[in-house]
């Protein structure tokens, strides 16, 4: 039995909060105003859209229960203002308990940790097992049968990238593939791109020079979540793509140089995109290379040597030399042949990858090369990933 399955055995009220005790012996307090704010009756909550109707600022300061009742599966309260009645499911109280928490935040969505467990990798790990899906199978997915999209999303999430085989060598079909997954994100590069190395946009991606491992969009406040490439044509040599599992590399840095890892979670790194005459994009707030969530877990790596701006806003000038030492240690790890997977893209095969996790690069090339692709927002992708792989109800239970 998990904590989510426990039943209510006792409730009490001490004036400012309601206490709930479960059959496992655990208990938690819930403030009066918090409980009133989270009433899910039809007057306070629009169930069809999962949105609050109650104006939280209208709740009186002296809000208090005049009656508290419970069953094994439900808490019932009658409030002193307008004798409003509220009910709270036992499972909901366990999931959202906060004083103290009954379950870790990372376990609020039932099954998430197990189903969406990531697999960090090295080059050796990927030998003979590159994740892939088939174009026709994915495109045949329907609202009634989304298993192919479910599988595709999970492979992208688990490994940080996925190939799509047997794609028509046609930009229009590639665009349809992107839209089958999620909405395409428009930027100053356009929505769906179709480009050659003609510098039609003043960015190194539109040249034939070597581009080292990086993530895209460090100059945006909201960096793209996914990126898809399709090499439509190449009449020449070179242009090999590489992928690096930056999350795996971050674990190495944290183990070998913990002080450098910690530094790179704090030092903000400014970035810009200013190649176009009418464009100079910079994030509202510069972000560190490693972004951690509230539990200290790594959720994003931002790394782009080309787009880094002049770093002149040091809170502690003594950290300047430490920063450069840290990124040198970091660069050594991500450039290790054991961690950098090189792959020759080819017409008819797309590559999609997690731009928050995987670095990509491209070696210098000769001849004419035509590429198409698109960005997809992370929030949109994660929403579809969760709903298809975990299920709508467990996700809704946690909001």
UniProtKB/Swiss-Prot annotation:
Keywords for the protein's UniProt record, in alphabetical order: Carnitine biosynthesis, Cytoplasm, Dioxygenase, Iron, Metal-binding, Oxidoreductase
EC class: oxidoreductase
Name of this protein: Trimethyllysine dioxygenase
Co-factor: note: Binds 1 Fe(2+) ion per subunit.
Keyword presence, Phosphoprotein: no
Biological processes per GO annotation: carnitine biosynthetic process
Needed cofactors: Fe(2+); L-ascorbate
Pfam families per record: GBBH-like_N (PF06155), TauD (PF02668)
GO molecular function, one term: iron ion binding
């Amino acid at each position: 039995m998990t904590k989510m399955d426990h039943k209510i055995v006792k409730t009490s009220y001490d004036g400012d909060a309601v206490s709930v005790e479960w059959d496992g012996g655990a208990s938690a307090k819930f403030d009066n105003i918090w409980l009133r704010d989270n009433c899910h009756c039809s007057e306070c909550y629009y169930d069809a859209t999962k949105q609050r109707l109650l104006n939280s600022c209208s709740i009186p300061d002296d809000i208090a229960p005049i009656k508290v009742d419970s069953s094994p599966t439900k808490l019932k309260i009658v409030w002193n203002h307008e004798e409003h009645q509220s009910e709270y499911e036992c499972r909901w109280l366990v999931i959202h308990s906060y004083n103290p928490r009954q379950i870790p935040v990372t376990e609020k969505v039932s099954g998430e940790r197990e189903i969406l467990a990531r697999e960090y990798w090295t080059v050796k790990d990927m030998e003979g097992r590159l994740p892939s899906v088939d174009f026709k199978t994915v495109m045949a997915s329907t609202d009634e049968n989304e298993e192919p999209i479910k599988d595709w999303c999970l492979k992208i999430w688990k490994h940080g990238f996925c190939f799509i085989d047997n794609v028509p060598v046609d930009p229009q079909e590639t665009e349809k593939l992107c839209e089958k997954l999620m909405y395409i994100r428009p930027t100053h590069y356009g929505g769906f791109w179709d480009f050659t190395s003609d510098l039609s946009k003043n960015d190194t991606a539109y040249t034939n020079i070597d581009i080292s491992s990086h993530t895209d969009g460090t100059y945006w406040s909201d960096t793209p979540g996914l990126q898809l490439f399709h090499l439509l044509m190449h009449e020449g040599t070179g242009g090999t793509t590489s992928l690096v599992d930056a999350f795996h590399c971050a674990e190495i840095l944290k183990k070998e140089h913990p002080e450098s890892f910690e530094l790179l979670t704090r030092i903000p790194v400014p970035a810009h995109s200013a190649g176009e005459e009418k464009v100079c994009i910079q994030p509202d707030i510069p972000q560190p290379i490693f972004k951690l969530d509230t539990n200290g877990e790594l959720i994003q790596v931002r790394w782009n040597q080309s787009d880094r701006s002049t770093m002149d806003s040091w809170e502690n000038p003594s950290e300047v030399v430490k920063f450069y030492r840290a990124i040198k240690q970091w660069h050594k790890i991500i450039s290790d042949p054991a961690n950098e997977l090189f792959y020759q893209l080819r017409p008819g095969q797309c590559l999609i990858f997690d731009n928050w996790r995987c670095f990509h690069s491209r070696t210098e090339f000769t001849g004419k090369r035509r590429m198409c692709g698109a960005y997809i927002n992370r929030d949109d992708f994660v929403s579809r990933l969760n709903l298809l792989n975990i299920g709508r109800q467990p996700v809704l239970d946690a909001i």
